[in-house]
């Protein structure tokens, strides 16, 4: 009789353990699904913000390019135009990564890419300053 009791208790313990393992697996999979959904939402929000930022920068760069395109330019304005063109290329490569990778495979120099990325920060500062100046002149 003790033997049957030991077997019954062992069976109950094994089944309880199996159920707890199964519950743990289900809760982990549910947690993974929730984490994945929240990551998708974050990526979606980030994508929307990035798209809006790119569109605003492209529009601002086009306005500044049109302003500097008409008439004579000083050497500084010419340098600003070159930087704006580089920014436009960078922004276009973000919109069309396939074309950017094709350019790279056709021998687009990696040093030039790094140089343009280093220039992108100061150019955005120049664009901001130029926009601030335009707003002051208008206002």
Swiss-Prot record:
It comes from the Eukaryota. Residues 1-18 form the signal peptide. It comes from Bombina maxima (Giant fire-bellied toad). Maximin-4 shows antibacterial activity against both Gram-positive and Gram-negative bacteria. It also shows antimicrobial activity against the fungus C.albicans, but not against A.flavus nor P.uticale. It has little hemolytic activity. It does not possess a significant cytotoxicity against tumor cell lines. It does not possess a significant anti-HIV activity. It is found in: Secreted. Transmembrane segments: none annotated. One of its GO terms (cellular component) is extracellular region. Pfam families: Bombinin. The keyword Signal applies. This is Maximins 4/H3 type 4.
């Amino acid at each position: 009789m003790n033997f049957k009791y030991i077997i019954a208790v062992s069976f109950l313990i094994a089944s309880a353990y199996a159920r707890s393992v199964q519950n743990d697996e289900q809760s982990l999979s549910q947690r993974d699904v929730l984490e994945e959904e929240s990551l998708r939402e974050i990526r979606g929000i980030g994508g929307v913000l990035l798209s809006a930022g790119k569109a605003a920068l492209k529009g601002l760069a086009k306005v500044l390019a049109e302003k500097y395109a008409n008439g004579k330019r000083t050497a500084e304005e010419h340098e600003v135009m070159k930087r704006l063109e580089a920014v436009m290329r960078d922004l276009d490569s973000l919109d069309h990564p396939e074309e950017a990778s094709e350019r790279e495979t056709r021998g687009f120099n990696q040093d030039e890419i790094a140089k343009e990325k280093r220039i992108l920060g100061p150019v955005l500062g120049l664009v901001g300053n130029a926009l601030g100046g335009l707003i002051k002149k208008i206002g």
